[in-house]
Amino acid sequence: MQGNDYVSSQMYAHGITCFTCHDVHGTEYPAQLRKPASTLCMDCHGPTSPSGPHAPTIAQHTHHKADSAGSECIACHMPKIAQTLGDVNVRSHTFRFVSPAMSETLKIPNACNVCHTDKTTAWATDALKSWTDRSPWRVGQ
C-alpha cells in the first residue's frame, strides 16, 4: 500500500528514496525516521523553499497551534489511512493533501477528518474555504 502510493508521488519523481527519510537499522524516532518528521520535511520544504510551506510560520500554514499534532507536516500530507494489528499507523505516502471533497468522491480518508473525527466533511470543507481562496486543493476543486 505505502509503496504503491509512493511510486506515484512527486517525491519519487524527484529521486527521493525511502532511505532519505527512513533508516532500516532503526532510530529513536517513530517509523524508523532519521529525524522527527517535520524536521525531515523542512530539510527540503523550508520557509525559503519554492516548494512550501507558503506561509511565514508553520502555524499560519496549518491553521493549528504551533507544536501541536495538527501542525506537523505529516498530519495533512501523510494522513493515517489504516492501522495494523500491532497498533502501527499506516500513513499515505503520496504526500498530497487529501481534501474533504476527494474523500467524498473517492471514499478515502481525508487529512482533516482523520483527526477531527467528530466533524463532517462539510465542516472540513467550510474550514478550508475560510482559510484561503487562493489554493484550489484547499477547497477541493
Task: Name each model-derived stretch.
Residues 1-134:
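Inter-heme linker and motif-flanking segments adjacent to c-type heme-binding CXXCH motifs
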Residues 135-141:
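Extended alpha-helical interface modules used as scaffolds for assembling large macromolecular complexes
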